[in-house]
UniProtKB/Swiss-Prot annotation:
PANTHER family: DIFFERENTIALLY EXPRESSED IN FDCP 8 HOMOLOG, PLECKSTRIN HOMOLOGY DOMAIN CONTAINING PROTEIN. This is Differentially expressed in FDCP 8 homolog. The lineage of its organism: Eukaryota, Metazoa, Chordata, Craniata, Vertebrata. Residues 77-116 are annotated as: Disordered. Pfam families: C1_1, RH_dom. The modification Phosphoserine is found at S501.
Length: 512
């Protein structure tokens, strides 16, 4: 209770009145208004009658209560995240209206300090929100937004031209939206150690003894004391603290949707075209005068800083197809990962890129002949039950394009040709396939041919080295017999005569 004296209150008595009211009334902090009220109370009252002094003291107390009520409604708890509004001054006896968060704070009188407790608390990281929404409400809102974005992306894909770059980008965007939606629907999946960032799918590594280098900060990853992740798509390795600093998307998406090589040998454009900055992280680089050394990538021809170019060595596809040069050259980290993912993809059509290569590299001619024979053997295996049960075609599962065409090559194929490995392995597979067709399987033997020109010799097959195949009817002949008869096919002549007889023979309606 406030102690009111009948005498003129001195400074200490006024201070006691203010302190009692402060203790009896909880508030959030001391502001300029409260300090002003305290200063007014501490001012000695003039002399006069006891009744007059009592009325003045009561009036001051009522005025203080009104100001304190307005102060409470004008300020929020400083531990809330959002700073509260302040109301306009109201006269005595007026009803205080509700204050909405949209109302602005009034300006304080000159000379009074600003009240900034909420901001200071937020800066210190001490703010709390005890009235936040449940996690499920945020999840439902995000799921609804993702579903709406997926539907809009579908509509955009249907409206864009077929096989256009914008349509491909929209398809990639749709895939990422679906993955994000699936992650939100299954937040408690069995793989909590996977993080998706910029098309990277990082998996938390469990190895503690293998020493690796972070691809972001270019420092050693100490597995015993540091957490690190590896991208399952491009094998990008980094510390857990460096995940949010990654700015380059995963190159596996580029391999999936734009699988092609740069076939110009070191297409340099100069540092001025890069604005004297790293082609990947945009850090300032130069050939001299700056701490970061400019390093050129032999694949892209661009310049990189020492953090993005570690002087890694790789075989350049353009030098292979044009010069048959397999010497490793220095490339950037991004090009290194891209070439590593592309090494087994058959995207090189050598006959169109460099047709003279088959004239100078004999191994390529042998490989092409073996691939053509395997394509001729494929129909036998598809229609043979024993071959399908034995899964003979799986002998080429590492090079699936060998059973699809004889024109496409991968960089790994050319590396194996240069090393002499591909010719030996392909010859063994060719021998195994021919043995099944000509010796082991009676059904495949029954599908052989007899030379209709000489009608002598063994059963012929289209993949035999001494045979020729008619381009029109696929009949097989001895090579010498076929060219001695001026490449005329008796089967084609017989089929043409049969067609003519069918057209010339009159029907029963014509004779009647």
């Amino acid at each position: 209770m406030a102690i009111l004296s009948l005498r003129a209150p001195g400074p200490w008595q006024a201070m006691q009145v203010w302190a009692d009211r402060t203790l009896l009334t909880p508030h959030t902090g001391v502001t300029s208004q409260v300090l002003g009220v305290a200063a007014a109370v501490m001012t000695p009252l003039p002399g006069g009658h006891a009744a007059g002094r009592t009325r003045e003291a009561r009036w001051d107390a009522m005025e203080y209560d009104e100001k304190l009520a307005r102060f409470r409604q004008a300020h929020l708890n400083p531990f809330n995240k959002q700073s509260g509004p302040r109301q306009h001054e109201q006269g005595p006896g007026e009803e205080v209206p509700d204050v909405t968060p949209e109302e602005a704070l009034p300006e304080l009188p000159p000379g009074e300090p600003e009240f900034r407790c909420p901001e200071r608390v937020m800066d210190l990281g001490l703010s709390e929100d005890h009235f936040s929404r449940p996690v499920g409400l945020f999840l439902a809102s995000d799921v609804q937004q993702l579903r709406q974005a997926i539907e809009e992306c579908k509509q955009v894909i249907l409206e864009l031209p077929e096989q256009s770059e914008k349509q491909k980008d929209a398809v990639v965007r749709l895939i990422h939206l679906r993955l994000k939606l699936q992650e939100l629907k299954d937040p408690n999946e069995d793989e909590p150690n996977i993080r998706v960032l910029l098309e990277h799918r990082f998996y938390k590594e469990k190895s503690k003894s293998v020493k690796q280098t972070c691809d972001k900060c270019n420092t050693i990853i100490w597995g015993l004391i540091q957490t690190w992740y590896t991208c399952t798509g491009c094998y990008y390795r980094c510390h857990s603290k460096c995940l949010n600093l990654i700015s380059k998307p995963c190159v596996s998406s580029k391999v999936s949707h734009q699988a092609e090589y740069e076939l110009n040998i070191c297409p340099e454009t100069g540092l001025d075209s890069q604005d004297y900055r790293c082609a990947e992280c945009r850090a300032p680089i130069s050939l001299r005068g700056v701490p970061s050394e400019a390093r050129q990538c032999d694949y892209t021809g661009q310049y990189y800083c020492s953090h993005c170019h570690w002087n890694d060595l790789a075989v350049i596809p353009a030098r292979v197809v044009h010069n048959w040069d397999f010497e490793p050259r220095k490339v950037s980290r991004c090009s290194m990962r891209y070439l590593a993912l592309m090494v087994s993809r058959p995207v090189l059509r050598l006959r169109e890129i460099n047709p003279l290569l088959f004239s100078y590299v004999e191994e390529l001619v042998e490989i092409r002949k073996l691939r053509q024979d395997i394509l001729l053997m494929k129909p036998y295996f598809i229609t043979c039950r024993e071959a399908m049960e034995a899964r003979l075609l799986l002998q080429l599962q590492d090079r699936q394009h060998f059973v699809e065409n004889d024109e496409m090559y991968s960089v790994q194929d050319l590396l194996d040709v240069h090393a002499g490995r591909l010719g030996c392995s392909l010859t063994e597979i060719h021998t195994l396939f021919a043995k099944h067709i000509k010796l082991d399987c009676e059904r495949c033997q029954a599908k052989g041919f007899v030379c209709e020109l000489c009608r002598e010799g063994d059963v012929l097959f289209p993949f035999d080295s001494h045979t020729s195949v008619c381009a029109d009817c696929s009949a097989v002949f001895h090579r010498d017999c076929y060219y001695d008869n001026s490449t005329t096919c008796p089967k084609c002549a017989r089929l043409s005569l049969r067609k003519q007889s069918l057209f010339q023979e009159p029907g029963p309606d014509v004779e009647a």
